[in-house]
Amino acid sequence: MTQFIDCGGSKGKIFITHSVASEHVFSLARRLAKYPVPVLISGETGTGKECVARYIHDNTYAHDAPYVGVNCAAIPENLLEAMLFGYEKGAFTGAVTSFPGKFEQANGGTLLLDEIGDMSLAMQAKLLRVLQEQEVERLGSRQCLPLNIRLIAATNKDLEREVTAGRFRQDLFYRIAVVPIFIPPLRDRRQDILPIARFLLNKYQSCFLRRVNLSDEACQALLNHDWPGNIRELENVVQRGVILAEGDEIKAADLGLPTPHAQAKPGDAMISDVRRHGRNAECDYISEVLRQHQGNKTKTAAFLGITPRALRYRLASMREKGSDMSGR
């Protein structure tokens, strides 16, 4: 049975479960919400780790309890300590005012440390001390603030392997991994693909004021794809299909994915033709998104779920092949 699980938050995120594997994830999350222990959520990029973290928070605390998330990989090492622990005015050059860190902001609620596997060993040692002592001290201060938080850590890495390789502290691993939750990649829970795709289709039909359906060949293409980018990639593909579909039906070529029929036929010519159609669909989609964002490459990259550098590379490649870049 398909379930639509409200993961809360201002963005109204929904996690859709249909497979046994995804139902198990939320069954475990529901049980963990009853106990104030650290939780480690692992899984590939785009599998929905932040959504599960928010679900645990919403089923643990009252609606007004703080929920604070930090992406450890997105903050430079020299700023992460100040961001997490806070600082007093004059603690370092540029500290013109005092700043409460993320631990303080999350006190009485949940702190999500996303991509904790990217944290340096030196920063791991400082984090471990805060977790052991259950108190935090701002940079430039001698006053300790007692903490009462639920820590959730998330990573796309195998932390046990990172421990073995000496890149992650074993004592910190045991501290944060009291109960681990693993979210399987989308390719290992294919029963979830079409329910998620149809939910996203309804979402973007409303956004783009279009009424389209997924053709049988499009559904088969979705099921056959391995989804290295998981749900995030699936969302981009569905958006692309809604935008590029001619008429009231999304075909496999609109998604930029090879059709089952094309995959089954032998011969390099057929494979080359499928790839060319996929590339053309991708170019059309990128051009359309760039146009919607009035040529703003930073916003376009964020919408596509790629880095600005990757977008620049794709745009350069498209120009070399003579693609229409009217969105510039």
Task: Please provide the spans of the model-predicted regions.
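Nucleotide-binding/hydrolysis machinery
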Residues: M1-E23, A33-K34, T60-A65, G140-R150, ...
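Short gly/ser/thr-rich secondary-structure transition/capping motifs
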Residues: G90-T97, E133-R138, R161, Q292
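Bacterial C-terminal helix-turn-helix
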Residues: V39, T45-K49, R54, I271-R328
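Conserved RecA-like P-loop NTPase ATPase core
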Residues: V25, T47, V70, L84, ...
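Base-recognition residues in the alpha-helical recognition helix of bacterial helix-turn-helix
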Residues: A125, R129, E137, P308, ...
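AAA+/SF3 P-loop NTPase mechanochemical coupling elements
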Residues: V68, A95-G108, L112, S120-K126, ...
